[in-house]
């Protein structure tokens, strides 16, 4: 618990240094690895804005979702912030960020009207409808399609991961709602 509090406090300090463009007010110059902030001892990397745990992503999602004008900010890999209320979509070890407003199109979870599934277009409303139906036919169809070669999650999904877990969690949450 204490380590988490320290990381949250550090994230708050870093947040204060971030400008609206998502880059630190003190711009890093080309540095060698000695000056790169190392991940926490357990390998986790936290969002510099909100302190949420980052998800490592490769070039596929970055190329797909980041506007060309800012794509060079995160050339090889980055971390994705899944916190829906955070303004940061992607960030790197230098705390350079790509903001949600700098993405090519609206994406879930930042925009609930955007598809949860980037490959097949399943939306929050589809999951909500399935939670009220006798059988979750849309979700079953998505599960079937997600195992097919048509699924391109590593490139199309905002986090580079299959959405099935997110869809199942949302379904369970909505099923319990009155």
Each model region followed by its residue ranges:
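Short cysteine/histidine-rich metal-coordination sites, predominantly Zn2+-binding motifs
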Residues: 61-71, 96-109, 132-137, 170-175
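N-terminal amphipathic/basic-hydrophobic helices that include classical n-h-c signal peptides
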Residues: 1-30
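Short metal-binding segments enriched for Cys and/or His
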Residues: 75-99
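Long, compositionally biased
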Residues: 147-178
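Short, flexible, mixed-charge glycine/proline-rich loop motifs
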Residues: 34-42, 70-75, 108-111
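Short recognition patches in nucleic-acid-associated and regulatory proteins
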Residues: 46, 51-73
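Short cysteine-rich clusters marking metal-coordination/redox-active sites
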Residues: 47-50, 81-83, 117
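Short functional micro-motifs and their immediate structural scaffolds
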Residues: 55-56, 86-91, 122-124, 158
């Amino acid at each position: 618990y204490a380590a988490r509090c320290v990381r949250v406090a550090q994230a708050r300090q870093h947040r204060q240094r971030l400008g609206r463009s998502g880059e630190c007010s003190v711009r890093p110059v080309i540095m060698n690895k000695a000056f790169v902030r190392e991940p926490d001892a357990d390998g986790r990397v936290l969002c510099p804005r909100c302190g949420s745990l980052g998800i490592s992503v490769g070039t596929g999602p970055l190329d797909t979702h980041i506007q060309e004008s800012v794509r060079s900010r995160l050339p090889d890999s980055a971390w994705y912030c899944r916190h829906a209320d955070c303004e940061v979509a992607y960030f790197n070890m230098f705390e350079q960020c790509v903001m949600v407003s700098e993405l090519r199109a609206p994406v879930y979870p930042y925009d609930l009207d955007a598809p949860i599934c980037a490959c097949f277009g399943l939306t929050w409303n589809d999951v909500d409808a399935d939670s009220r139906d006798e059988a979750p036919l849309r979700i079953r169809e998505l599960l079937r399609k997600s195992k097919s070669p048509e699924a391109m999650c590593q490139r199309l999904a905002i986090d580079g991961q299959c959405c099935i877990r997110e869809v199942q969690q949302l379904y369970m949450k909505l099923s319990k709602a009155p």
